[in-house]
Amino acid sequence: MNKFDRLCEQLFKVNIPFSQNDGIISIQPDNANINIHMSIYVGVSYYGWYKRINNKIESGVDENFQNLLVRIMNFYVDYENTS
């Protein structure tokens, strides 16, 4: 299983609604009270990825959701380092 599929699997396990197309995962959380659309580009560095997410998250997003994204990013970094 490649890292993109692994990441999709993690999102599925924690019940985050997402769609994927051409190596880009789009997340639109149902539990956020605002209109938010994030694209996570798989394969860029940890810092680039984190910055990308921070640039796209608007104020008011559920704090638990942000923490969840950080956990997912950490999973991805760990996977990168061991593959």
Residue ranges: model-predicted function:
Residues 64-76:
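A short, charged, amphipathic alpha-helix used as a generic interaction element across diverse proteins
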Residues 13-15, 42-45, 74:
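Glycine-centered secondary-structure boundary/capping sites
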Residues 40-54:
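Short aromatic-glycine-(Arg/Gly/Cys) micro-motifs in beta-strand/loop hairpins
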Residues 75-83:
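Metal-dependent nuclease catalytic core centered on acidic motifs
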Residues 1-31, 50-66, 82-83:
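Negatively charged, low-complexity tracts enriched in Asp/Glu with abundant Ser/Thr
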Residues 32-37:
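Short, charged/polar, Gly/Pro-enriched secondary-structure boundary elements
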